[in-house]
Structure formats: C-alpha cells, structure tokens
C-alpha cells in the first residue's frame, strides 16, 4: 500500500473525530490550546489502538477467508464509507457527539474516551480489513493516530467558528475516501489475478 493511500486512510478515519471535536469546541465556547491538546491526546491514543485491535482479530480469521479477503476489505471499506456519508447527510448540523458534560471546560476523560471509542469503531474495521493485506499495521495505526490528533486540535479550536458547517461535510468526504480506497484494493487484486 502506498504512503498516499495510508495517509488517505488516516485522514478518512479522523473525520468522525474531527466532527466530534468541532462539537466539543463549539460547546466549550472559547477553547484554549490546552483544551484542544487534552481532547486530541485522548482521541489520538484510542484511534491508534483500535485499528491494531481490529488487525489482530483479522489475523486470527485470515487463514479461513484468504480466497475472498479482497472482497471483505472492499465490503468493509465501502460499507463504512457509505455509513459515514449517510451519517454526514442525516445529522443536519448535529456534530456534537460528546453528549456527556460538553459544557464543562474541564470535562473528565471518561466521557471523552467514550466519544473517542465511538468514533473509532470504523478504525477497528479498517484494521480487520488490513489484516488481509501485506502491510505493517503499526505504520497505518500511527498515521491514523497522528491524523486524528492533528484534526482534533483543529476541530476543537475551530469549533466555535465553524460549528456545524464543516463537521458533516468532513464525514462525507471521509466516506468517499474510504469507498475509493476499498475500490482500489478490489481492482488491484482482481487485475493482478485476472
């Protein structure tokens, strides 16, 4: 997998967290850099860990499904992409996914971790699909974590200004990227074996 593809996966996986961070920043009102870093560390760590967990699950099952693994990767990535697009279209401006104590500048880490975990389920599914490819999951997980960390900082800081306008659109763009990556994996496998 090319470095550009890995970066695109990292960006796509961080759009949910970006949308949640915009909501968090809007709820804080006037977030400080310290607030943004606090939220970004929690989201970044969880987004780094979940693809590794998914990859481990995929490795366990890989020898059972090796003949159609490219279809699984395509299905998971495309399904997640469609899900993200639908969520982005139906949220109607509700980007604040952190429903627990969003107005408290010093929110405890547990509600933030729960939100981060909820937005990282797709990263776990990516990890499962990557288990069927010849790729170093640590590199992909690190890129996903760094992209998430960076985008969450921007999301929190820009939350007050951007509000709902960017949040939903970021999720739609992330979904489109996942569909393209899934289609590319399927095309490459079919063209190499066909």
From Swiss-Prot:
Its main location: membrane. One of its GO terms (cellular component) is plasma membrane. The keyword NADP does not apply. The chain crosses the membrane at residues 3-23, 37-57, 65-85, 112-132, 139-159, 170-190. It comes from the Bacteria. It is found in: Cell inner membrane. InterPro entries: Mntp/YtaF, Put_MntP. Belongs to the MntP (TC 9.B.29) family. Probably functions as a manganese efflux pump. This is Putative manganese efflux pump MntP.
